[in-house]
Amino acid sequence: LHLSIRRQRQMCIRDRNGRKMTRIILCGCCGKMGHFITQLVSERTDCEIVAGVDLNVNAQTASYPAYTSIDQVTEAADVIIDFSHPSLLTPILHYAAEKGGIPAVLCTTGYTAEQTAELTKASETQPIFYSRNMSLGINLMLELAKKAAKVLGDQFDIEIVEKHHNQKIDAPSGTALMLADALASVRDGETQYMYDRHAQRKKREKSEIGIHSVRGGTIVGEHEVIFAGNNEVITLSHSAQSKELFAVGAVNAAVFMSGKGPGLYDMSALV
């Protein structure tokens, strides 16, 4: 009986070609993104969820065990996907380190500067995948925007507009800041982010990147990068039609990260 169970377990962690499947711990398993990821993984043959973590485990109806704390997880895993809350960053990093450096795919937004520094420091000894947006499309747009900024130089003003549903708490969005940081990294000199022109009664500075937030309805997520020059405007835009696309990116990242060594990885590795 024990041998039979063991063989069944071995079969469920290998795909039809005999390759080892990626075993995932899903933090935030009872949230909207958790449900998307659970459904997506159930349809794939290269990975499986072996355990979930969520404070609201009563809502968990999936076929895997769920816990209220990651410290309670005993199932062996190859990678952690986190779609929970910024406050859980430290416990997740500690757990990953204690388990021999399990890769962590961090998809949660709203980290403070101190938390970003914490995960960056952890990546020196642990494999960490961190992106403020798991969409392949938005990350391709980011690379295109960087290319445009290099070519256009300071002859074009840059403005970023982000739109989200009326339940989103943080503003500007993590993705808008990700875009701004990427653009600032390829510009000459220092860049200032301008969030509120109402408070600044002066002409626009060339060194500025304007960032504007819109909240309303059920908008999943829209981002525009505007390059405004003399007599011409170039706009790069991305519109998310469903949060499911973020689940696809997260699971692809998890499979990619399985077995990776220490370092800080992001979506540029998948673009």
Residue locations for each model-derived region?
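Beta-loop-alpha module in the N-terminal Rossmann-like domain of NAD(P)-dependent dehydrogenases
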Residues: 78-97, 110-115
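Alpha-helix C-terminal capping/helix-to-coil transition sites in glycosyltransferase folds
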Residues: 8, 75-76, 80, 125
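Rossmann-fold NAD(P)-binding glycine/threonine-rich loop
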Residues: 94, 107-128, 139
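Glycine-rich, highly charged phosphate/nucleotide-binding loops
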Residues: 62-72, 81-90
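Single conserved hydrophobic/aromatic residue that forms the stacking wall/gate
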Residues: 1-15
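Rossmann-fold dehydrogenase core element
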Residues: 102-103, 118-135, 153-158
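C-terminal substrate-binding/catalytic lobe of Rossmann-fold NAD(P)-dependent oxidoreductases
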Residues: 25-27, 32-71, 154-271
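Rossmann-like NAD(P)H-binding beta-loop-alpha module
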Residues: 140-155, 171
